[in-house]
Amino acid sequence: MQTSSKTGNEHEKAQQQRDVEEQETRRDDVSLGPGEILQLEHTDAVLDAKMHLVNNAIDQIGFTSYHWQLFVLNGFGYAVDSLILLIQSIVAAQAALEFHPGYPNGLTIAAYVGMLVGALFWGMTADIVGRKIAFNVSLVVCSVFAIGAGASPRWEVLGLFICLSSFGAGGNLVLDTAVFLEFLPSKRQNMLTLMAAWWGIGQLIAGFLAWGFLPNFSCQDPAFFPDAAPCTKANNQGWRYVWYTSGSLVFVMSILRITVIQLKETPKFLVGEGRDAECVETLQFIADKYKRQCSLTLEKMQACGTTDTRALQGKSKWGLGSVWAHCKGLYSTRRMGISTTLIWLSWTLIGLAYPLFNVFLPAYLSSRGAAFGQPSQYMTWRNYTLANFSGIWGPVLAGWMCGTRLGRKYTMAMGALVTMVFFFAYTQVRTADQNVAFTCVINFCLNIYYGTLYAYTPEVLPSAHRGTGNGIAIGWNRIMGIVSAVIATVADTGTAVPIYICAALYVLMAGIAVVFPFEPYGRRSS
């Protein structure tokens, strides 16, 4: 009897212990834990709990070849954004010799207007209809109009096609970071910064295309060659070949995006939409395909409660009220509001400082006696390619720095300050070799800041409003690009004042980076 009673007590204690462990496991499943960036903001307890489960599942699955495919295919978007923006600036001078436009900076403004509208359109619709559609469609739109730009019969038509091509490309910086981040395990989040290396690859491609076509298939500028033949379509095909080739390359990239990965909607977008079953199905699909564990179930998601989608979308998902609701969501708490404002300010400042520097520097150096001579087109585009190649490695270093205790904030601050130092030093350039060297170093240092800002922005934005917040941020950047083009047309470019203003802006950007409210290092994005 005593043995039987003792055995019964042991079974009872064992059952009680199992019950306690089960309760603790359930509590851990639905609690926020210490890892989420926005965990202390308490904007939506149900959504926060579900997001914690999704992050746990993504971390449990780990990094797979699926993520490498995402890294490359999303990187295409980065490359295309920089490719289209640079191609228009590269071909503008040769196209102007053929068309004799009344407003030489018109192509720059057309490109930035297209990029602005694209960033806002693709970013905001990504929060409404999802990331998948824009991921599959945007590059197709870009490629079609890029090819059309090469066949333009007039300056105005060229500007229109550049604007439409830029519209397709303009949403990629918004979408690519969001798509990659929302599938990415937390231990690999610094790869989001590394992905900005694709921006440099796009610049490098632009340099190679210019180097290959323009020296061999372009008319000569009468300003430097008085005996040059009149510039016509027949003897000035180089800039058209650049557009045809770049458009075709983007089209191939768009087909690869659609066929290689057949992207499923991101799990974090699905959670925000209240589509828990689809979220679980997506993560289980990835786990099964790559033979990984995934303990997330629909029951665990439903145990957290029901997501209030009306609070995230407004009264109507398809009206302006939805856009307003997503904008309000970025200011749900005081710290989130400060973070959003500082991010937008940073994008505004860098959007003005970098193009303004490039606009004023050549005239400033010329007025101070810098003697570069008139290099051949071959040497011009060789140097351009070298500078763009240097820009690839800034995000590589930044990706490593972000994975250390420096974190994102101090990586940005250091990148901005070092860039400022070399900007000041660049004003003392006097020879062609110095010009090439400093251009390469500045491209490298600038992309440390730029690449980290690209990654930091989506990391600290809530997933339900990520596209809207990121789109508006990049939109401010594009507005400043338009402003810089206008300034270049009407301002006196012989003064040193703009150079020092640009340097001061980089100091301000470094200060803003340090006081950002959130540091993603060691934490998980929502």
Placement of each model-derived feature along the sequence:
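Conserved MFS/SLC helix-loop-helix module at the cytosolic interface between two early adjacent transmembrane helices
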Residues: 117-156
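Helix-loop junctions at membrane interfaces in 12-TM secondary transporters
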Residues: 150-161, 215-219, 427-438
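Flexible cytoplasmic loops linking transmembrane helices in multi-pass membrane transporters
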Residues: 37-69, 228-237, 246, 284-359, ...
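Extracytoplasmic
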Residues: 67-101, 206, 210, 354-365
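Cytosolic juxtamembrane N-terminal segment immediately preceding the first transmembrane helix
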Residues: 1-93
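Central mid-sequence intracellular linker of multi-pass
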Residues: 195, 212-313, 503-526
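Helix-breaking motifs and short loop linkers at transmembrane-helix boundaries and internal kinks
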Residues: 99-100, 130, 151-157, 168, ...
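C-terminal transmembrane bundle
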Residues: 109-112, 124, 162, 166, ...
